[in-house]
Amino acid sequence: MTKGILGRKIGMTQVFGENGELIPVTVVEAKENVVLQKKTVEVDGYNAIQVGFEDKKAYKKDAKSNKYANKPAEGHAKKADAAPKRFIREFRNVDVDAYEVGQEVSVDTFVAGDVIDVTGVSKGKGFQGAIKRHGQSRGPMSHSSHFHRAPDSVGMASDASRVFKGQKMPGRMGGNTVTVQNLEVVQVDTENKVILVKGNVPGPKKGLVEIRTSIKKGNK
């Protein structure tokens, strides 16, 4: 069955394996995960748990900042006897009988050796050209060349008379939801509530990440 938790990417470091091998790892801090709702096949058509992460300030009348929860969010969290949460995500295909509304989801949900998928928002790179954004080749850099870092041809013959949708062109790069699959949990530190994941995960430092059981290898 699927397991999941939300956390913040702290950064990267390295640890030594049992055979002395140096392993690069990403540190993910996963605190304040609470089950806000359970969904079942009988009521909702599928099994899932709704997990909230990071407390939000209580409702405040006329508050314009999104740091404060609104009344619906506060009422929803109150059913779980929890504070309003800033981030709420759903994990499907879980063993709902193993969870209770209001229960804290801790890092020991995972153990060393688990294979996981990690989802995050990639770093934003701003407006970039086709060479950096899509990996296109540049032209000659010699003095007589008139083509250095321009995009590939996007024009069509008179038959089409238009640029096709999906043409690779300059534009905003990064800031996309990215999932890296089949990563390995190296260590779980229950005292500091952190998970060490082998390799790198999407997003900047302090970015939100979702850790869940690998969809390809997790249930084998």
Swiss-Prot record:
Keywords: Ribonucleoprotein, Ribosomal protein, RNA-binding, rRNA-binding. One of its GO terms (cellular component) is cytosolic large ribosomal subunit. Coiled coil: none annotated. It comes from the Bacteria. One of its GO terms (biological process) is translation. The keyword Ribonucleoprotein applies. GO terms for molecular function: rRNA binding; structural constituent of ribosome. Pfam families: Ribosomal_L3. Residues 127-155 are annotated as: Disordered. InterPro entries: Ribosomal_uL3, Ribosomal_uL3_bac/org-type, Ribosomal_uL3_CS, Transl_B-barrel_sf. HAMAP family: Ribosomal_uL3_B (MF_01325_B). Part of the 50S ribosomal subunit. Forms a cluster with proteins L14 and L19. One of the primary rRNA binding proteins, it binds directly near the 3'-end of the 23S rRNA, where it nucleates assembly of the 50S subunit. NCBIfam families: L3_bact (TIGR03625). Belongs to the universal ribosomal protein uL3 family. This is Large ribosomal subunit protein uL3.
